[in-house]
Regions:
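Conserved short alpha-helical segments that host acidic/polar catalytic motifs at enzyme active sites
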Residues: 1-270
């Protein structure tokens, strides 16, 4: 696909793909695109090019069409000598956070060398109809996860559609206000060997304009990018109900008891 757009993306895992919801206003959009390109280069990566994502807005309802963003993909080259995978994704994460803090008009759906998120204000049955990429037989992935969720605590929007970058989760997090407040309080003492000189670029961790699911996603993503394995990060943020479980192994209880001193549960019925 990119050959027809005039740029090469290189070998597998040698590039990252960003999915963007840009404003429809052409001037604002071009300024945002240029800003992202500058940030990518400043972070030591190569910006390869843009691609307008082919869509079928005619299948959407009137409200979804009225607020539909301009959807584009940006391609970023991995720095020479950098390991593929999480090391590269961590660099992309830093670039995304810098961009998000300098541009409030654009929503970065995903930016990764391993995953691409397709989502919007439509039903699951309309996903492949709206994104023609997903109808292409040459489009291959090791796994695909699909999730549908109607807004209950927040108004529906393209940005708040599911899934998010790391999680597929129904939300309904009853403890969200306390969770967010405590994450904010921890930021002054945050340290990570992976963000030794870049911690200020990724803070604040939580975008409080997002839904409860989005804010959990922010926290989980930060923990993984800071060096915690994903399964552990999930067990720390959403622990099993261990305290009163008389059948749970004592070592497992000790595990949850230990991590409960570091992170309160993001709790809810879902």
């Amino acid at each position: 696909v990119t050959e027809h757009l005039g740029f090469q993306i290189g070998d597998e895992r040698a590039y990252g793909v960003g999915m963007f919801f840009f404003p429809q206003d052409e001037l604002i959009r071009s300024q945002a695109m240029k800003m992202f390109e500058i940030i990518v280069r400043k972070e030591g990566m190569t910006f390869l090019g843009w691609r307008e994502v082919p869509t079928a807005p005619e299948i959407l309802g009137r409200k979804a069409v009225d607020v539909m963003p301009y959807i584009a993909q940006g391609f970023v080259g991995k720095p020479a000598g950098m390991k593929a995978g999480l090391d590269f994704d961590r660099k992309l994460y830093i670039a995304r956070r810098v961009f998000e803090q300098s541009n409030e008009d654009t929503y970065v759906v995903s930016l990764s060398s391993r995953t691409i998120v397709y989502k919007g204000m439509f039903l699951v049955s309309e996903l492949r109809l709206f994104f023609s990429d997903l109808q292409d037989e040459d489009y291959k992935s090791a796994i695909a996860i699909v999730h549908s969720r109607f807004s209950t605590n927040t108004n529906p929007s393209w940005m708040r559609a599911h899934p998010y970058r790391f999680i597929v989760h129904n939300g309904e997090i009853n403890t969200i206000r306390g969770n967010v407040d405590k994450m904010v309080a921890r930021e002054e003492n945050m340290e990570s060997e992976y963000f030794r000189y870049d911690m200020h670029k990724v803070l604040p961790i939580i975008n409080q304009e997002g839904s409860d699911s989005a804010m959990l996603d922010n926290a989980l993503e930060f923990m993984v990018m800071s060096g915690m394995d994903l399964p552990l990060a999930v067990m720390v943020t959403i622990p099993a109900p261990w305290e009163n479980d008389k059948y749970m192994d004592s070592e497992i209880k000790d595990f949850y008891r230990y991590y409960a001193t570091m992170m309160e549960p993001w709790d809810g019925p879902a």
